[in-house]
Amino acid sequence: HFIKISISLGLSGVLHLVLIINFILDFEIFYEPRYVIPIAGMILANSMNVLSLAIERFDKELSRNESFESARKTSFKSALIPQINSLLAVGLVSLPGMMTGQILSGIDPLIAVRYQIMIMATILSSAGISLIIYFLLSKKN
């Protein structure tokens, strides 16, 4: 599992990090650690959680003699539930740390909300793509 997980997280994480840093945020110096480290940490940590949930569920489904496709579909859906629920709750039930920190530091709340939406969408996208890559690599074995 380790190689497939590493490839899945690496490809998805780097892809999303490059897209955000270069095209969405458009920083002058894209490799500056104060930008790259927190964004990469949020992307990779959440993708890792989703991937671990999916793999655990996938292995359970396969142990029940489910087909590869059925186990993949079930684990994909169940692993993304926490991410989708957190998207639904942002701003209504919970205020994420990044958004709260920006608001407390004096940033316009609308800008803070835009950044938070971007991060949440990126986390969901990165998690989904890392799952897709993992299952594509698993299918070949």
Predicted regions and their residues:
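Membrane-interfacial segments
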Residues: 23-31, 62, 104, 108, ...
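Transmembrane alpha-helices
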Residues: 69-96
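Loop-to-helix entry region at the N-terminal start of transmembrane alpha-helices
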Residues: 1-46
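Structural signal for membrane-spanning alpha-helices in multi-pass inner-membrane proteins
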Residues: 16-21, 101, 127, 131, ...
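Hydrophobic alpha-helical transmembrane segments of polytopic membrane proteins
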Residues: 117-139
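Internal alpha-helical transmembrane segments of multi-pass membrane proteins, especially GPCRs
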Residues: 7, 76, 114-121
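Membrane-embedded alpha-helices of multi-pass transport/permease systems
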Residues: 37, 41-69, 133
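Hydrophobic, glycine/alanine-rich multi-pass transmembrane helices and their short helix-loop junctions
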Residues: 92-114
